[in-house]
C-alpha cells in the first residue's frame, strides 16, 4: 500500500527529528498543523501565517515560524493531500518536489493549516553523522 493512502488522521515526522517532548504527539488534533517555532530570523525552512492560518513558506525568512518536521493531517486534509501528491508527482518536474510543497505551494488554498507552537527544547534535528554519534554512543565506533 502506498503511504499517500495513510495520511488521514495521521502525524508525519521527518526522519531526522528526535522528539524530546512526547506531549507534542497528542491523542486528539482537530486541525491540520505544522509544528513551528516563532523566530525573528532563520535560514531554515519557515512558515508565514495570517490569523493562525499558514499562508506560505520559504527557505529563510523573518518574523516567521521555523518548521520542525512534525505535521498532523485531519481525515479530510489527509485524503486531499494523498490525491494532490499523486497529481504533483505526475506533473513535469513533480518527482523532484518535496511532499510539503503539495499543501504549502501547489494547493495551499485548498487547506486550512495551523501552526502548533513549540520550542527548540522539544526536538533535536540530526543533520550529520557526528550529531547522531553525539546523541547515541552506539554509533561511535
Predicted feature residues:
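Conserved alpha/beta core of the MobA/IspD/sugar-nucleotide pyrophosphorylase nucleotidyltransferase superfamily
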Residues: 67-141
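Conserved core of the sugar-phosphate nucleotidyltransferase
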Residues: 20-93
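Short phosphate-binding loop-to-helix
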Residues: 1-9
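Short beta-strand-to-loop acidic/aromatic patch adjacent to the donor-nucleotide binding site
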Residues: 9-18
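General alpha-helical segment detector with a strong preference for membrane-spanning helices
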Residues: 18-20, 132
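A generic structural signal for short, non-catalytic loop/turn and secondary-structure boundary residues
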Residues: 12, 28, 40, 108-111, ...
Amino acid at each position: 500500500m502506498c503511504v499517500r493512502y495513510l495520511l488521514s488522521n495521521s502525524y508525519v515526522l521527518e526522519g531526522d527529528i528526535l522528539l524530546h517532548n512526547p506531549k507534542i504527539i497528542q491523542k486528539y488534533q482537530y486541525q491540520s498543523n505544522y509544528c513551528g517555532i516563532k523566530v525573528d530570523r532563520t535560514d531554515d525552512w519557515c512558515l508565514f501565517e495570517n490569523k493562525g492560518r499558514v499562508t506560505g513558506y520559504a527557505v529563510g525568512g523573518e518574523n516567521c515560524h521555523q518548521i520542525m518536521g512534525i505535521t498532523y493531517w485531519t481525515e479530510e486534509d489527509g485524503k486531499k493531500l494523498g490525491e494532490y501528491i499523486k497529481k504533483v508527482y505526475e506533473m513535469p518536474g513533480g518527482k523532484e518536489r518535496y511532499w510539503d510543497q503539495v499543501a504549502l505551494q501547489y494547493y495551499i488554498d485548498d487547506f486550512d493549516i495551523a501552526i502548533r507552537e513549540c520550542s527548540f527544547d522539544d526536538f533535536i534535528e540530526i543533520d550529520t553523522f557526528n550529531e547522531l554519534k553525539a546523541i547515541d554512543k552506539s554509533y561511535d565506533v
